[in-house]
Amino acid sequence: MVPSVMEGAPQLGITSTDTSSAGVPPGLKLIPTDRLDRRTDEEIAAWLQTRHPVTSDKNVWAFWHNGYTNMPPWVQRNIINWVRRLGPDWTVHLLDRVDGSATNVSHYVDSSFFPECFNNNTMDGPTVGQHSGDLVRLPLLWLYGGIWIDAGSFLFRHVEDICWNKIEDPESPYEMAGFVIEMRPGVEVMLNGFIAAKRGNPFIKRWLEIFKKLWDGATNVQGFHKHPLLRHLPMLCPPIDKLNLPPQGLNVVMEQFTDYMSQIMSFERLRKLVDPSDGFNGPEYYSNKMLLCSALQETFYFQLVTEWSGTKQFNLLSTKRKGEGVVKDENWHAAENFVHDALANTATMKLSHGPPGALDSFLADLWDSEEHHGKDNEDGTFAAYLRYGSVHFDQTREMVPIKMGWPDEEVLEAGVLEPKK
């Protein structure tokens, strides 16, 4: 039996009248209900645990290594809301590595795409789930096309409006899309939590080849920054001032941080590589064929305005918005501004668990804890209102892409899997 994901909270679906008294906030408009998936949350939850045929490139891919029923309830609600928001034209595939599961990734991707440690279940270390997801996402996009979204993400805008309409437009130069952030002073780096491309994309193919190669003989990512394919690249070092990080910065050694981000480092290799054997030009592709938007605006805006404090985010969203005893004090208005700002001005909200220990607190960790399992959707709170708005509101703003030029850093002329000499 599929467990309910509502934890006693009112259903987010079609009958809610949450905005009837407050009206629609500035920068937003109501989505007609006929554009939404009208099934109950329980029906969508059951549907997510069955295998669905791939009939087009309009796929949203996500992964949870030990399956839907082992997801924290807040993550389950994320995926359910994607299905409801995206409607019938898009298929959300939530894959796993559970033996006998109808949604096991092995039904979609041949073992030849994965390293030995993945196929033999010998990956180790504290980030097996995260890096299993890294290994899965690129083969899925290469084989089937669509959009990879990390399961810990809220979706505040339809994926067609974020990027897909432009990828599908024959008059548009764009073939891939994602979000970039300054990971070294003056250097914008594309993240891997939101990746869009049609099947057979040439950049995706080479990217997955590089990342898979890192895993030869490995069972975790430790030391990947020293791998022959990556060792010529500068290590990641996010600028504290530009990201509005806490004064102490990230509580992590940069070598370990760079290893954790090794799939992003594989991207970095490829975007600065020209392959003379087949003419592939990474800088040209990155500059002209990728639709890139600011991650600080489109996925980490909530972090930027709270100094990356999970505790601060938790307290804002746990604030009572309506009901008996509500006092509209300074904290209430801060919570309202936070939620309205997120709903109107950022495309997604990605909650992560790591790198482990990098920050003093992560909202994902707080919502993971059993004592807080319903806090992301507790009746009458701003968290529940954020959930409601993520399904029922459309943004009126236009997203503005960033134009990337030719990299200022060294461009490597070599084969995709050829180390720098």
Swiss-Prot record:
GO cellular component terms, A-Z:
membrane
Where does the record place Polar residues bias? Answer: 13-22
Q: Which GO terms describe its biological process?
A: mannosyl-inositol phosphorylceramide biosynthetic process
Enzyme class, broadest EC rank: transferase
Q: What is its EC number?
A: 2.4.1.-
Task: Name the Gene Ontology molecular function terms of this record.
Answer: mannosyltransferase activity
Identify the metabolic or biological route this protein is part of.
Answer: Secondary metabolite biosynthesis
**Keyword entries, A-Z:** Glycosyltransferase, Transferase
Q: Does the keyword Transport apply?
A: no
Q: Which residues form a coiled coil?
A: none
Task: Point out the signal peptide segment.
Answer: none
Q: Where is this region: Disordered?
A: 1-26
| Family indicated by similarity | Belongs to the afumC glycosyltransferase family.
The UniProt entry, under PANTHER family, shows: INOSITOL PHOSPHOCERAMIDE MANNOSYLTRANSFERASE 1, MANNOSYL PHOSPHORYLINOSITOL CERAMIDE SYNTHASE
According to its UniProt entry, what is the function of this protein? O-glycosyltransferase; part of the gene cluster that mediates the biosynthesis of the brasilane terpene glycosides brasilane D and E. The biosynthesis starts with the activity of the terpene cyclase braA that converts farnesyl pyrophosphate into the sesquiterpene alcohol trichobrasilenol. Subsequently, trichobrasilenol is glycosylated by the O-glycosyltransferase braB putatively using UDP-GlcNAc as sugar donor to yield brasilane A. The latter then undergoes two rounds of oxidation performed by the cytochrome P450 monooxygenase braC.
Q: What is this protein called?
A: O-glycosyltransferase braB
Species of provenance? Annulohypoxylon truncatum
